[in-house]
Amino acid sequence: MSSSTVITNIAALVTNDPSLGDHSPLGLVRDAAVVVEGDRVVWTGESSKAPATDNRVDADGRAVLPGFVDSHSHLLFAGDRTEEFNARMSGRPYSAGGIRTTVAATRAASDAELEAGLTRYLAEALRQGTTTFETKSGYGLTTADESRALRVAARHTDEVTFLGAHIVAPELADDPAAYVDLVTGEMLDACAPHARWIDVFCEKGAFDGDQARAILTAGKARGLHPRIHANQLSYGPGVRLAVELDAASADHCTHLTDADVDALANSRTVATLLPGAEFSTRAQWPDARRLIDAGATVALSTDCNPGSSFTSSVPFCIALAVRDMGMTPDEAVWSATAGGAAALRREDVGRLVPGAYADLTLLDAPSHVHLAYRPGVPLVAGVWRRGVRKV
């Protein structure tokens, strides 16, 4: 039998269970404790009521919240696009290939190089409180390169997404229909065994609504669950397609009609917002307030990728969401934990309740609000993943 540990003297415990504590969506418990046994939470509540345990950890009056759930990232890549970012931020034209630059570098990298990069970024995210990671392929765009990326990812996370439909592969740029046939045929056959999800970039210059529907429908037929890059750069069919196909998440959601917002609010599809992308491209911010007020479920994620959002920091994204997207600190923290779990259709992460994984983030602050109140400050003082302290 596993030994038990109580983490006690917690100033403010975010459980994301509204039946607990202050009965808010965060289920905030003051002067709290958490009991962990093995890889699971077995008890949460007030410190004075905590059961006896084998071990004790003193939180010393600091805040504890669920480990962040980063439900959208692109960590399987090689190369660097510093010059592109520098030119964009300096207002200079830049003619290099964008995603295609990363595709070329990723194809040229060895498996060991891809894995080293992935593990480096995962460790970086873990140090900042992220305990559940989704990541995608999408920088290979050949059957061999997409499938090897997914095999590498599957060694490190259960949340692996096949994104062969990121852009049309450069060698088939003049024949996008042939590339869709490749993605839905040979490439899907090779990639489906290594992924849980299928994704598509539904946007002008990438894949239109009909192409996206064909790709996601083919993936569903192979047992992959759909998610979609939707309505990032322009108004389009992505969000409504996500709802139609019961996608777990529609990601970006910057350009939304009233009908798009209503569709999300009346569905299980989560609107995953990615403020790192807007920060890094100086683009229009998504209107989180509009979505939340309409009743949509919102998640916050990093979109960590080498081109448009090279950050693995969920705390940074929380601060951006509060400052620039109309979210309250409570809403942003919920969206980065329970919201991310909803975007992955998970109930065992993003919450600190009996039966959930013991994924906890300890802050060097008395309240979760400090994540937005003190942007840029390294507040994460400890991280437990599956009951084991990692930081």
UniProtKB/Swiss-Prot annotation:
Name assigned to this protein: Imidazolonepropionase
Ordered alphabetically, the record's keywords are: Cytoplasm, Histidine metabolism, Hydrolase, Iron, Metal-binding, Zinc
Quote the catalytic activity from the record. Answer: 4-imidazolone-5-propanoate + H2O = N-formimidoyl-L-glutamate
Note whether Cytoplasm occurs among the keywords: yes
**What is the recorded function of this protein according to its Swiss-Prot or TrEMBL entry?**
Catalyzes the hydrolytic cleavage of the carbon-nitrogen bond in imidazolone-5-propanoate to yield N-formimidoyl-L-glutamate. It is the third step in the universal histidine degradation pathway.
Look up the record and report any one GO term of the cellular component aspect: cytoplasm
Q: Name one Pfam family in it.
A: Amidohydro_1
Which GO molecular function terms does the record list?
imidazolonepropionase activity; iron ion binding; zinc ion binding
Q: A Gene Ontology biological process annotation?
A: L-histidine catabolic process to glutamate and formamide
Q: What EC number(s) does its UniProt record assign?
A: 3.5.2.7
Name the pathway: Amino-acid degradation; L-histidine degradation into L-glutamate; N-formimidoyl-L-glutamate from L-histidine: step 3/3
- Residues reported to bind 4-imidazolone-5-propanoate: R81, Y139, H166, Q232, S308
Cross-referenced SUPFAM superfamilies: Composite domain of metallo-dependent hydrolases, Metallo-dependent hydrolases
* Keyword Acetylation assigned: no
Record-listed Zn(2+) binding positions: H72, H74, H229, D303
What NCBIfam families does the record point to? hutI
Cofactor stoichiometry and binding remark: Binds 1 zinc or iron ion per subunit.
* Family annotation (InterPro entries): Amidohydro-rel (IPR006680), HutI (IPR005920), Metal-dep_hydrolase_composite (IPR011059), Metal_Hydrolase (IPR032466)
